[in-house]
């Protein structure tokens, strides 16, 4: 059974991101577009809460139900919400195209109802040596976010 979800990002960065998963055993395809980004890499994460009452700050930390350190999307030891970076070329829109085998739209670890956050700076993927590298990737301010909702199949 295919599950689809959508996230409308608001803030200084704006856009729409779509999620699609064929079954609980297949990767999630993430696609979309974001505008309002400076020309550089921007951290792109799923955060724990679907709460944007205080802007992006109320979305909490990266979604990390298994208590792991921050890492790259290809790392075994990573938060579920660690989706790496999107690269803005300075032109609007910035394309989002990610395929991830750790996040899911099914079951207890589903990302539906949680928040996508776009950060001002690059995610160092837990390898930067900064005090925030192992928790946030030192990706800087939260410049856009939106709650992931169920979409029509």
Curated annotation (Swiss-Prot):
Residues the entry annotates as binding Cu cation: 45, 47, 62, 119
Q: How is the cofactor bound?
A: Binds 1 copper ion per subunit. Binds 1 zinc ion per subunit.
**SUPFAM superfamilies tied to this protein:** Cu,Zn superoxide dismutase-like (SSF49329)
Q: Does the keyword Metal-binding apply?
A: yes
The record's EC number reads 1.15.1.1
Task: Name the CDD domains on file.
Answer: Cu-Zn_Superoxide_Dismutase (cd00305)
Name a biological process GO annotation.
positive regulation of mitophagy
Q: Which GO terms describe its molecular function?
A: copper ion binding; protein homodimerization activity; superoxide dismutase activity
Segments forming a coiled coil: none
State where Zn(2+) binds: 62, 70, 79, 82
Q: Name one GO cellular component term.
A: peroxisome
What is the protein name stated in its UniProt record?
Superoxide dismutase [Cu-Zn]
- Provide the gene name from the record: Sod1
Q: Where in the cell is it found?
A: Cytoplasm
The UniProt record lists the keyword Cytoplasm: yes
Question: What single Pfam family name could you report for this chain, choosing any that match?
Answer: Sod_Cu
UniProt keywords, alphabetically: Antioxidant, Copper, Cytoplasm, Disulfide bond, Metal-binding, Oxidoreductase, Zinc
Cofactor requirement? Cu cation; Zn(2+)
EC class? oxidoreductase
What function does this protein fulfil? Destroys radicals which are normally produced within the cells and which are toxic to biological systems.
Describe the reaction catalysed, as an equation: 2 superoxide + 2 H(+) = H2O2 + O2
Disulphide linkage map: 56-145
The UniProt family comment states: Belongs to the Cu-Zn superoxide dismutase family.
């Amino acid at each position: 059974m295919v599950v689809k979800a959508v996230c409308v990002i608001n803030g200084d960065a704006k856009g729409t991101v779509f999620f699609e998963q064929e079954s609980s055993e297949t990767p999630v395809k993430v696609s979309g577009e974001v505008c309002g980004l400076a020309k550089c890499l921007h951290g792109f994460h799923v955060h724990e809460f679907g709460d944007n009452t205080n802007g992006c700050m109320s979305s909490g930390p990266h979604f990390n139900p298994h208590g792991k350190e921050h890492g790259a999307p290809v790392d075994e030891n990573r938060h579920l919400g660690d989706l790496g970076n999107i690269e803005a070329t300075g032109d609007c829109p910035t394309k989002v195209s990610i395929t991830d085998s750790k996040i899911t739209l099914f079951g207890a670890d589903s990302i539906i109802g949680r928040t996508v956050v776009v950060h001002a700076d690059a995610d160092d993927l837990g390898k930067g040596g900064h005090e925030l590298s192992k928790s946030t990737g030192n990706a800087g301010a939260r410049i856009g976010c939106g709650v992931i909702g169920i979409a029509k199949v």
